[in-house]
């Protein structure tokens, strides 16, 4: 009996011990759960283990690498490559776009292998201390820990795959205020509940609007959302804290979030503390409605099909079809810019873009066109119409950098590697001249572009290889700077696009504000550094055998002397050369094909404008003649009043009044033209010759010969009976007029032939003015034969003077009138120093008359003058300044509109030598001399 009792007592004691141990264990576990895991706890391996929440929240994980990434950014590409190799990672070409990927991979590897590098121990400890549980998000504000509370946000899933676009603003933790009255209630709910769930909206690429309502892709699991993105081509997803926002994104309503430069708010919706409203707990967003509306509008361009990229775009690049290529990319910018602002892949497998193919196929024009289009803001606005200028420039710089420096997938070769490898010097010139190019990038075999020159083309010449090496060394230019004043020009220091931090020369020569402002007028290049320095020295101090001539050119031509010297040296050495021409408005070498084409277009436009101007002037002149000539017996008032000073109605009134006061003594008119004087001179001569004669005409009109006899070229005989002879004052007046015209012609033209031609043209123009007044028939055709005999005698007398040996024949005058010899120069019908400068620039150019007909005609017109005459031509500025002091011998429109036209002058207004602008002062002087001659004859 004793043994069973002892056994029962032992079992009871053992049971109580087990019960006590269980209670103690439960208490310990409760305490541990109550306190929660400490952030400084170590795992089994002895390394710091981040809490599960840190792994679940991408924002916290990225924040732990900030300091490490900042240290890696300080390393140069070679040191970074060594660290990547030491960490056991594969290293490819490190460029400005791929560097971030390698830095991120290296940072993750270093965090996992923290024991290898002692320099990262401190950082790991700090990173571990910074990680916090999402449930411990309450932060004190102004000493009160219960006033405000914040939740950590979920980082937006951006461009984490592939190459990153321009860095958007950092997504920071957003704290939303909670009313103090709800603090206790919120604390109770926060401790009992977990972090609010996330909703992932997947937005496919919809091809039409009705398809947006068919199905909505919203997931609560991130893996499911990623799987949906992989299955739906071209789709994207984003995390939201509410299902409504995720559904809006999936439908495409809230497509993008604001650009970094437009708002300071984060790109993705921010999870905030639950707020009480209408007795229900709702998830609020710290994003105002006004800023939510300000979204980036998605463009309507579709992703091109793979067949279009290969069959259309790539074929156009390979064949060098610039028009087809330009039409494709401007019709749809996604031919060049893919998702994530990455270059569009035109050849799968190797992942070639347009620049790879163009560099491989030696299509330098396609390379240049691609860069020009990508750097055009209008093209980028097709993709992002709502971006401001700053963000647009960031995108442009990013995309251009990707096109220039992105390696392919096989050998990590950049477009510059391809151009050098195949010996395409023109492509190397285009690529290496861009300021964003990386010339020392290494491929898979650790070779730079300079190391692979002509690897795939062994038969290339040594000169070509040397030229490619010079292109890779850098592009330098030798500039010529001029001031707006008459100070001497300055040959500037060497300049290169690579010089970003420091400028070799500034816009001012010197440091004083009183120094003149200098502008770029010409430059030689691109050249290698050695050639550019040699050319600069040669330009400043020419060789001894040419020093005298070049010094004379500089001193004798202060406007373009230095340009002429630099041009001759550059052409002699075969260096590229351009200079600025004001009338073209661009930098160009006129001796090149491009320069000749621009000059041809300019001269063609000048000729077209001149013809249109002449037609307009002829129409205006005919309208004025019809308005001022109402009949054959009308008195012309142009000798006493300009047409511009009186209206058409006033002219008609005065003509009618004169017709009523004068007897009709004029007979019928023919259609031939024979008068040698302007209308006003003839009126004065007739009044002075026959002041009281019964057959004198007060209107001053002379009458032509008989039509048939004039055409036969015979001189008409005066009819029998009354013969009215003009006094000798007529011959005196003719001689006086010729002397006056001869003096005017000599003052303008130095050669006697030109003076004679000018005089004949003026006489012919005056005859034509009278002819226009005599064309219309008048009511005086019905007068008697006596008046007709008087008219015939007067016409015969005037015809005799006009057809005398001292004057040109009538047929020659008509021929000159019908086909005047017009010579069009750069600034009108008169040459200037600019014509001489352009002729000097075309000295070594071969102008094809079939390809450049306008340039050939202009050059022939300039070469008609002797070198001494060309040296005396005024410059455009001086010519425009003194134009008002020179007589206008060529009549209206002697100058083409432009910089030579006098301000405020009417281009259709006749000049001093025109019949329509004969001054009353000259008429009165001529009248007095005619009367004195008449008295002397008596």
Swiss-Prot record:
ANK repeats: 411-440
Topology class, membrane: Single-pass type III membrane protein
Residue numbers carrying Phosphoserine: 259, 268, 488, 496, 512, 528, 662, 804, 896, 914
Major location (coarse): endoplasmic reticulum
Annotated Basic and acidic residues bias: 609-627
Disordered: annotated span: 609-636, 870-924
UniProt keyword terms in alphabetical order: ANK repeat, Cell cycle, Cell division, Disease variant, Endoplasmic reticulum, Membrane, Mitosis, Phosphoprotein, Primary microcephaly, Signal-anchor, Transmembrane, Transmembrane helix
GO biological process: one example: cell division
Family: Belongs to the ANKLE2 family.
Protein name per the record: Ankyrin repeat and LEM domain-containing protein 2
Organism encoding this protein: Homo sapiens (Human)
Name of the coding gene: ANKLE2
């Amino acid at each position: 009996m004793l043994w069973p009792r002892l056994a029962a007592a032992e079992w009871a004691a053992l049971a109580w011990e087990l019960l006590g141990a269980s209670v103690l264990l439960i208490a310990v576990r409760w305490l541990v759960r109550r306190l929660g895991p400490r952030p400084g706890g170590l795992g089994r391996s002895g390394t710091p283990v981040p809490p599960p929440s840190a792994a679940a929240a991408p924002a916290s994980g990225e924040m732990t690498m900030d300091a490490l990434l900042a240290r890696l950014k300080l390393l140069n590409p070679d040191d970074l490559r060594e660290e990547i190799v030491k960490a056991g990672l594969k290293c490819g070409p490190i460029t400005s776009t791929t560097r971030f990927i390698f830095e991120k991979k290296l940072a993750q590897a270093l965090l996992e292998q923290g024991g290898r590098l002692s320099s990262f121990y401190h950082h790991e400890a700090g990173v571990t201390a910074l990680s916090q549980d999402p449930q411990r998000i309450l932060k004190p504000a102004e000493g009160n820990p219960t006033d405000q509370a914040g939740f950590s946000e979920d980082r937006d899933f951006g461009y984490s795959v592939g190459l990153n676009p321009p860095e958007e603003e950092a997504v920071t933790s957003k704290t939303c205020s909670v009313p103090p009255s709800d603090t206790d209630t919120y604390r109770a709910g926060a401790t009992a509940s977990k972090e609010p769930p996330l909703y992932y909206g997947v937005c496919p690429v919809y091809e039409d609007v009705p398809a947006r309502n068919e199905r909505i892709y919203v997931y609560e699991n991130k893996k499911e959302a990623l799987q949906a993105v992989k299955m739906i081509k071209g789709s994207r997803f984003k995390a939201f804290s509410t299902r409504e926002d995720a559904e809006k994104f999936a439908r495409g309503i809230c497509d993008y979030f604001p650009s970094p430069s437009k708002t300071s708010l984060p790109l993705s919706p921010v999870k905030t503390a639950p707020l009480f409203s209408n007795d229900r707990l709702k998830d609020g967003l710290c994003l105002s409605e006004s800023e939510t509306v300000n979204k980036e509008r998605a463009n309507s361009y579709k992703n091109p099909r793979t067949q279009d990229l290969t069959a259309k775009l790539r074929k156009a690049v390979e064949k060098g079809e610039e028009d087809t290529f330009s039409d494709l990319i401007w019709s749809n910018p996604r031919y060049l810019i893919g998702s994530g602002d990455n270059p569009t892949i035109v050849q799968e497998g190797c992942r070639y873009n347009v620049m790879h193919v163009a560099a491989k196929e030696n299509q330098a024009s396609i390379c240049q066109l691609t860069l020009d289009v990508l750097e055009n803001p209008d093209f980028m606005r097709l993709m992002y119409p709502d971006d401001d200028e700053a963000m647009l420039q960031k995108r442009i710089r990013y995309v251009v950098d990707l096109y220039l420096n992105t390696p392919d997938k096989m050998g990590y070769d950049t477009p510059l590697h391809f151009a050098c490898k195949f010996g395409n010097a023109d492509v190397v010139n285009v690529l290496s001249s861009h300021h964003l190019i990386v010339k020392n990038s290494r491929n898979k075999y650790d070779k730079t572009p300079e190391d692979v020159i002509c690897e795939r083309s062994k038969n290339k010449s040594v000169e070509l290889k040397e030229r490619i090496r010079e292109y890779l060394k850098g592009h330098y230019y030798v500039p010529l700077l001029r001031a707006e004043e008459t100070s001497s020009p300055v040959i500037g220091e060497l300049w290169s696009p690579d010089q970003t931090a420091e400028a070799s020369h500034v816009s001012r020569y010197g440091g004083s504000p009183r120094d003149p402002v200098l502008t770029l007028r010409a430059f030689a290049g691109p050249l290698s550094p050695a050639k550019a320095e040699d050319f600069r020295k040669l330009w400043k101090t020419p060789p001894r055998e040419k020093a005298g001539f070049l010094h004379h050119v500089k001193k004798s031509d202060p406007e373009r002397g230095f340009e002429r010297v630099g041009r001759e040296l550059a052409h002699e050495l075969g260096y590229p050369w351009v200079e600025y021409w004001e009338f073209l408005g661009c930098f160009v070498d006129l001796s090149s094909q491009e320069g000749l084409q621009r000059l041809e277009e300019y001269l063609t436009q000048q000729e077209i404008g001149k013809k249109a101007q002449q037609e307009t002037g002829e129409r205006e002149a005919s309208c004025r003649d019809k308005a001022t000539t109402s009949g054959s017996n009308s008195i012309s008032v142009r000798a006493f009043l300009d047409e511009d000073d009186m209206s058409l109605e006033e002219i008609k009134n005065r003509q009618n009044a004169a017709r009523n006061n004068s007897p009709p003594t004029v007979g019928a008119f023919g259609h031939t033209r024979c008068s040698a004087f302007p209308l006003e001179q003839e009126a004065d001569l007739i009044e002075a010759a026959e002041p009281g004669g019964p057959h004198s005409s007060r209107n001053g009109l002379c009458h032509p010969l008989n039509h048939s006899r004039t055409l036969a070229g015979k001189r008409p005989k005066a009819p029998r009976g009354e013969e009215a002879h003009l006094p000798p004052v007529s011959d005196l007046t003719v001689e006086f007029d010729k002397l006056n015209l001869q003096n005017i012609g000599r003052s303008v033209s130095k050669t006697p032939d030109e003076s004679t031609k000018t005089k004949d043209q003026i006489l012919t123009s005056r005859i034509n003015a009278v002819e226009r007044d005599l064309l219309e028939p008048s009511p005086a055709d019905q007068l008697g034969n006596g008046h007709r005999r008087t008219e015939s005698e007067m016409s015969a007398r005037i015809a005799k003077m006009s057809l005398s040996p001292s004057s040109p024949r009538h047929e020659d005058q008509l021929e000159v009138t019908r086909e005047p010899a017009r010579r069009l120069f750069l600034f009108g019908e008169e040459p200037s120093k600019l014509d001489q400068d352009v002729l000097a620039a075309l000295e070594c150019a071969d102008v094809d008359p079939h390809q450049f007909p306008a340039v050939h005609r202009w050059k022939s017109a300039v070469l008609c003058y002797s070198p001494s005459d060309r040296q005396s031509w005024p410059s455009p500025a001086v010519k425009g300044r003194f134009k008002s002091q020179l007589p206008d011998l060529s009549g209206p429109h002697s100058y083409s509109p432009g910089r030579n036209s006098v301000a405020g002058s009417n281009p259709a207004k006749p000049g001093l030598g025109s019949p329509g602008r004969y001054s009353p002062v000259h008429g009165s002087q001529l009248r007095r001399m005619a009367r004195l001659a008449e008295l002397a004859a008596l």
